[in-house]
């Protein structure tokens, strides 16, 4: 769009951005399944799932451009899953009663990131973008109250360098690593957002932190982070704990295995409490319910802080090959970490810090309280209220980057009619 862009990342390549860890999918209101989805329904589900605390104008725009995101990504070559006839496949996610989530097995974030990286590489090749890897932003340069560049540290040489610009865009994710353990990569340190805050950018809703219900439980004293298991597993997996406290005690002592507990002694507590949604309740509901069961003594691992996510019924109904096709890489990851096969035994999961709905305050045009400083994706506060729906993080990041920021930033950097009159 005519911009010359300096792109900075703290990693050795943009391909190592934490979006690569997003597994389950990306939402869009395409209604390919003809199950009643629409732009308005996606808007409503997002606002309701966020406890009515999101900025509704931003959310409606997000729902409107969601369909364009899928078209853009397909054009970039992102290998979304397809049905037998060749049409794009969908699945359901928590907080929705329609199938609107597009996915690429359990690697959706990775494939979307590679699609975006290929487009970035093309712009680097033609000279419109210059890439700076292994740089950490230290400060925002303000001139007459407007963002006019940054100070960044070269992490290879240790030198501080300055870069001038007409506008600055922050797209650095959330602050989940403020907690001792989270699912965030260690590079997600919130240093860029904090630098903006120190310069006077407003921060909004910092208390809104999402606790994801399906993470591998803590299994050692020397962990630096927790591992996410995709919410998409709740499509076919069933969450349960024993009905009897004595069975829970045996599980915690290691004298009983989950697969040996008969069906009549299992409490599928989400299906029992929320029959309309079943296991696909919103994340905050599933996390609170799991903690409540464990606090009552029904936890299933040696710490008592885990519940079962069981695929035995899905394997019997669909066959092992179909389940492996949908979730094979996630099962492999789980087995690599825990040395337990989800095909043979129920997975153990427990809630963990995952996503931050709060962030830098932005207006409708994604500009912060500092003129010329924009914040997009997870590092702003605008779209998810008090709780994000599953598969909406990728949707927001791509909507902001592909379909909102190019136009709002262009509007900011272009001469105004008043400027033209003066000239």
Task: Report the location of each language-model feature.
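Conserved redox-cofactor binding core of oxidoreductases
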Residues: 74-159, 171, 215-229
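Glycine-rich loop(s) and the adjacent beta-strand/alpha-helix scaffold that form part
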Residues: 167-222, 384-407
């Amino acid at each position: 769009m005519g911009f010359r862009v300096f792109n900075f990342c703290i990693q050795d390549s943009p391909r190592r951005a934490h979006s690569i860890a997003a597994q389950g999918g990306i939402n869009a209101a395409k209604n390919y399944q003809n199950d009643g989805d629409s732009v308005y329904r996606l808007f409503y589900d997002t606002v309701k799932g966020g406890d009515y605390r999101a900025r509704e104008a931003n959310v409606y725009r997000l729902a409107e451009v969601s369909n364009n995101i899928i078209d853009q990504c397909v054009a970039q070559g992102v290998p979304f899953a397809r049905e037998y006839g060749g049409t794009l496949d969908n699945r359901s996610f928590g907080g929705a009663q329609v199938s609107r989530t597009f996915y690429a097995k359990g690697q959706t974030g990775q494939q979307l990131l590679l699609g975006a990286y290929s487009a970035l590489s093309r712009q680097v090749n033609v000279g419109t973008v210059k890439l700076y890897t292994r740089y950490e932003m230290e400060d925002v340069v303000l001139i007459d109250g407007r963002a006019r560049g940054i100070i960044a540290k070269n992490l290879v040489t240790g030198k501080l360098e300055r870069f001038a610009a007409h506008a600055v865009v922050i797209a650095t994710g959330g602050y989940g690593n403020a907690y001792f353990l989270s699912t965030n990569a260690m590079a997600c340190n919130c240093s860029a957002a904090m630098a903006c805050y120190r310069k006077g950018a407003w921060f909004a809703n910092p208390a809104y932190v999402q606790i994801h219900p399906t993470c591998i439980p803590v299994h050692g004293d020397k962990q630096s982070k927790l591992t996410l298991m995709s919410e998409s597993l709740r499509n076919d997996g069933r969450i349960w704990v024993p009905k009897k406290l004595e069975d829970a005690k045996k599980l915690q002592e290691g004298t009983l295995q989950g697969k040996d507990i008969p069906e009549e002694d299992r409490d599928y507590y989400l299906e029992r409490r929320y029959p309309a949604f079943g296991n696909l309740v919103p994340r905050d509901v599933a996390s609170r319910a799991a903690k409540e069961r464990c606090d009552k003594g029904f936890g299933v691992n040696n710490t008592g802080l885990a519940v079962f996510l069981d695929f035995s019924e899905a394997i019997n109904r669909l066959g092992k090959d179909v389940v492996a096709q949908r979730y094979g890489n996630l099962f492999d990851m789980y087995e690599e970490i825990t040395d337990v096969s989800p095909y043979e035994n129920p997975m153990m999961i427990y809630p963990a810090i995952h996503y931050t709905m709060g962030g830098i305050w932005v207006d409708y045009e994604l500009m912060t309280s500092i003129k010329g400083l924009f914040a997009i994706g997870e590092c702003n506060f605008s779209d998810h209220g008090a709780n994000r729906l599953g598969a909406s993080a990728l949707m927001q990041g791509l909507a902001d980057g592909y379909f909102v920021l190019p136009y709002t930033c262009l509007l900011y950097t272009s001469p105004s009619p008043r400027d033209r009159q003066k000239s």
